[in-house]
Curated annotation (Swiss-Prot):
It comes from Lacticaseibacillus casei (strain BL23). This is UvrABC system protein C. Residues 15-92 form the GIY-YIG domain. Residues 197-232 form the UVR domain. Belongs to the UvrC family. InterPro entries: GIY-YIG_endonuc, GIY-YIG_endonuc_sf, GIY-YIG_UvrC_Cho, RuvA_2-like, UVR_dom, UVR_dom_sf, UvrABC_protein_C, UvrC. GO terms for biological process: nucleotide-excision repair; SOS response. Keywords: Cytoplasm, DNA damage, DNA excision, DNA repair, Excision nuclease, SOS response.
Amino acid sequence: MASAHIEHKLSLLPDLPGSYQMKDINGKIIYVGKAKNLKNRVRSYFKSSHDGKVAAMVSQVADFDFIVTSTDKEAFLLEITLIQKYQPYYNIKLKKGTGYPYIKITHERDPKIEITGTIRKDGGYYFGPYPNVYAAQETMHFIQKVYPLRRCNGYQGRPCLYYHMGQCLGACFRTVPEKEYTDQIERIKRFLNGNVGKAKASLTAKMERAAKNLQFERAAEIRDQLHYIEQTVEKQKIISHDNTTRDLFNFYMDKGWISIQVFFIRQARLMKRESRLFPVVNTAKEEFESFILQFYSRKNNVKPREVLVPAALDNKVLADILEIPVRTPQRGEKRDLMALAAKNSQIKLEDKFRLMELDNRTTIGAMKELMAALNLPMGHVAEAFDHSHIQGADPVSAMVQFVDGQPAKNNYRKYKLDADKTHNGADEAANTREVIRRRYTRLLKERAPLPDLILMDGGEIEMNAAKDVLENELNLDIPVAGMVKNNKHKTAALLFGNADQLINLDPKSQGFYLLERIQDEVHRFAITFHRQLHAKNSLASRLEGIKGVGPKTRLKLLRKFKTINKIKEAPLEDIQELGISKKVAQALKLSLTAEPTPARRV
């Protein structure tokens, strides 16, 4: 079953072609795919049953991302590029090998056309990469027939077979003029860059002629050849035909937010994409220019040979600061890429707004469910409390606040309990009375708003202790419920009412999910605070009995090392740097070697 986060993102997928990237819980890309329709393809992973490797992959997906393209063919080539870049685990298993073909015109006196899997700086012309080896080969064979160069091994004193077939210019028996090669190479370059109109028209005429003459096999061959050419040669916006390293920036702004896309073009391919979203303080132009400059001020950031930006920016100023050319594409492939980045920026920001709206509906709905389960009117603010101590030592309490189902972390509070003075730190009822008294006495004194619901981690002891203070000491009427856990220490139900009624929520409901979040969050907050306090107090108490370590020295040690283990592991020289003599430093390390067995934390 997909998580709520993934369900929300699935509902926002566009009906457009593109590449999608599946990520695990650590944000690592584990699978890259392509789709003619992103919505249908990505949803199919989570809405259908699978087995084998697909099921294994889906079980690890914690998030996904996508890049919209103009055509499904661009999605195919982008998928190739991303697989080569990230080497995702499941792609490597499902698609062995990462070599994809290029069509190459060699740099020789008598050049030839060939298929290669490697780009070298040898002066040759490279076109690709292409997704289909067979299609690339068929296109190359077509070029050899229509735009022949050299197909033989060179001069041999007599015409080769390919010359007689019209597929070689004759380097096998004569000196071919360089201009003849140059003109032919220009025709091939135009063809491979997408200018295939004349060639396709010629093939179509041949196919129709063959069909008219009942040469159906020949007509079918030509039809397949046309298909291969369309599949392989059609110009791609994602792929650039030169090797200049470029970074392309574009943005979209709406409702006080700016969405920025950065396309990294390396080795003639889109190698990486970064997305950024943040609220706008200045104008979009100022924010965007500031982002670009900060982008290259990051540590270890390597600048490209060229930066591409949309119109209306101060290109000269940016170029002067970055010390590299900053240009705005006016036509062709680069302008199309710029438009694609703008489109992805808009989709990213619109997705954020929709997710915010969905999250808002979900969390408000969850709070409404929680209040309804307790037969209470709709409320907005819930405060939850939990205690932590080790067999009564270093007792603390923590309070977290949720507003409309969302954590309000600025309103979280931590309390060191006065257990040594007033009660046993292991007394859960006394701990509850103290923290409830302190929290709501303070709110009354400050005339601050009171919560609509108080949740106590635990059971009837904590719940009734809280109610006792609120009703009998502070004269407050705030509903209090206990968050009950099962024997696996997981959220199970609520305890509420004068009769300590057990109220079960639907485990699949948003209300139950919110209750789990609140209980986990307050427990985490309390435990973290207790660990910090206990470590500090344990270190201080261990240091008190060591001869030569007075209050000032203890303070220095606490500030520098913070834990006993760090002092034990520290070289004597580090301890002596605090102004401690070698003799005292040695006594200190010796005294700390015997650690007491830690007691259970609750």
